[in-house]
């Protein structure tokens, strides 16, 4: 039986203070690199090592924030930013393509102290969607902004826009071409688009990255980052 590699990652990467049972101020962080179904058999040992190294970097980055007394929101943002900067995950620089060959990114974050949240959707020129989602939460009267409106808000906040091709990667592009071939073949057999999309193998159905953290003050925060897939 084939084991989904990212399912292993999602369940195994968890960092907890060694002093959690003794200290008065325990803290913790958990991350996942995607809830997709990329089969482990598709990775060489070297590739799997690279994935695990980046996941370790992400969780350790968030852990360091908490260990130094930082807030859970900062830990979540820091951990997810690491994953967004990597081409290995379906977020930020590793985002899969839309059907027309571009990239549209989404992210959201929530503060457990007051249940405030911020989100962005369908942004094309934002290098770190999770950071923009946090700006929406902190500096906007809205909970969610999308598309051009989100990017106009980003410029108002001093966020530099980037070219959409920053998110291009060869493996994702090859996956797009294969997926489009399968969709076209399915539609040629009289299947409408949604039915054809559902017929895609699990290897084309990828998930988000995310993190949840508890800081020394007992505050919980969570965030996630992903993209619009094959729209």
Report each predicted region and the residues it spans.
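Alpha/propeptide regions of enzymes that mature by internal proteolysis
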Residues: 23-230
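Sec/Tat signal peptide C-region and signal peptidase I cleavage site
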Residues: 18-22
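Bacterial N-terminal signal peptides
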Residues: 7-17
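Positively charged n-region of N-terminal signal peptides that target proteins for export
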Residues: 1-5
